[in-house]
Amino acid sequence: MTAVDLEFDQLNSTVDALRRSISNRMMYGVGKDAVTARPHDWLHAAALAVRDRLVARWMKTTRLQYEQDVKRVYYLSMEFLIGRTFTNALLALGIYEPMREALAGLGVDMEALIEMEPDAALGNGGLGRLAACFLDSMATLGIPGFGYGIRYEYGMFRQQIVNGEQVEAPDYWLRAGNPWEFPRSEIQYLVHFGGRTVQRGDYVEWIDTQHVNAMAYDTVIPGYATSATNTLRLWSARASEELDLSAFNRGDYRSAVDAKTMSENVSRLLYPDDSTPAGRELRLRQEYFFVSATMQDLIRRYQRTHSTFGRFAEKVAVHLNDTHPVLAIPELMRLLIDVHHVPWDKAWGQIQQMFSYTNHTLMPEALETWDVETLARLLPRHLEIIFEINAQFLKHVSEQSGHDAEMIRRISLVDEYGQRRVRMAYLAIVASQKVNGVSKLHSQLMTRDIFADFARIYPERFTNVTNGITPRRWLAQASPSLSSLIDEQIGTHWRRDLFELERLRELRNDSAFVDAFREAKRQNKLRLAHHLAHHTKISFDPNALFDLQVKRIHEYKRQLLNVLHVIVRYNQIRANPERDWVPRVVMFAGKAASAYRMAKTIIKLIGDVSEKVNHDPLIGDRLKVVFVPNYGVSVAELIIPAADLSEQISMAGTEASGTGNMKLALNGALTIGTMDGANIEICDAVGRENIFIFGHTADEVDSLRAAGYRPRQVYEENPELRMALDQIRTGFFSPDDPLRFSDIFHTLVDWGDHYMVLADFAAFAEAQKEVDERFRTPRAWTESAIENVAGMGQFSSDRTIGEYAREIWHVKSLDMS
């Protein structure tokens, strides 16, 4: 291999240079000229021209990382919801306007190209978007690191709304290719499944396995206004045997490719339906596939500059984004003790210094577990390692706790009640040097409730790092009108230091600024109204209050509470049409998991309510209900900047943090919410007078439950609520199928109302009256909106990553000089 430095053209980014680069890439990269090029070809050529400018930074960053022998962060996540890359890269490089001019000079509309780029379908919701924000901030701060995940061929699904119901279609986002990625066919690792184990002296050999190849695909993650970059490395499954030639020659063409198809299914689809045994097994195979390849890859990278594992923990930090990647722990142990023959105690000691784990849920039923039988069949060696870790852990705790048998059962990594299951979150805690929650309340409840025993055993391990979002995408990119206004007033440095937004507080009494702020918001509302009129055929007044609840459809997020208020408001308007109502457009967006029947029923209820409300001539423009289909990053960039009101109404104690609340507040939406997750910290940051708080607190929820909560009593005592629920029960919104929503009624009224929808309804309705009153005074509303933007400094993912780097990973920024 040559060590000679390559000579290459240093690309500048003038309009002429960009135009020439696009032309070259069209000719030599796409293989077309201007006569035959189609719009997607122009997008591909422009993307390659931008990618070329990132690569030199990428190479420099990689070389400096090796020269400085830095500690690297390996961020493992099943999801990376990165959205579109083109605009983000232009803003990071500072070449948005030059690129627009360059394309215009070639007769191409850049805005049309931007709309053609598909979202990378590598995630579903907040978990994946958080991971993407973190990669952006790591690169911007110069934190050396890699994101690792799976290169799904299909996303979770493309959501269509047909007759008010969710219909799932394949999301083949790679149909036109992906110009941003670099296939690395030379970087492949064997990933094993099944087989059996054999003791070979002082180590164990795993034999008779089936295997699949994991091939790397790399994408450059640019930092903003810096030459530092990082890498997102995604694994794609490749069959170790492409074709059974003997079967093919016999004419058995299907059998000839069966093994290849089965192998490559591992990276085919994000979150296969796990309501069947086959779906659950595929999910487990996915999780192990990506962590096995990742652990092999980080060992290879470490060994390039180190001959022993003595400094392994000094140079490697592995972060687990939720429990999906927890199998990385036994896999790294297996590689160290069985392949590299590191003694158990030394290997385990290194692992406990390297790993950290972020918990994202307070609901015990959402903590991932795997049954012992399946693990024994698919990953027999890993189960042995988990059993040994558990035995040593329980022995240590038993000696310290005076042999408390009940506690030992509670904290065992293996749940022995009923079907034996391995508790993945517990394994992560035992192996990690730090475990963090993602908001102050979440971290408190995590150590008080679901992990209370572990918090007593390892008090020093538990900490809080409140989530954050990247302001580059969620304000600079998503809302050009508002970000341009802010630039005019305080400059552009807020993109790197979000606390700069505090200076906007000085302008809340400046009439010219308040008017300009309101106009920027109005432009965003017009943009969204135009989009929805085209895509949903629903038109509405852009001067109405835009009321948004955009998030995964789940009972704990309480879209039902919002729907009930919509129905009550609808009934009130019909009863009093002459009253001066504040016009309101209530928008929902989000996907329901394909196997989650209740969530899909909630979507159908929203659809049926929308159909009734939007076609009632007595209602007119005073109330509209819209479900925006296929919610993802690009849809969010369109819808979030237009919001007036942000619905963050989960039952207190259920939402770990939330990041949609931060994105909406950053764009000047006022929050209506419970004291849950990061809402509490947003309330502190923007002032109680600039947010609408309602409902039971987490402690009050516990007290109400302990006292014997009776939702039917609430139903009977509130006439407006009772009428709305009866309309749901009797088919008022579903005359074609009157019993369609009977389960919703019974869940809320007769089956315990687990998420306290009815308990919080009266307080929610009162808070909505406050919303109406504030919105009637545009000046007061806009001043509160300005306060929300100004208070968002602490919710930048740059702050979050800075805390991770200092407190958890113990890693320093790369010296780019």
Description of each model-found segment:
Residues M1-S817:
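A conserved ligand/cofactor-binding region detector
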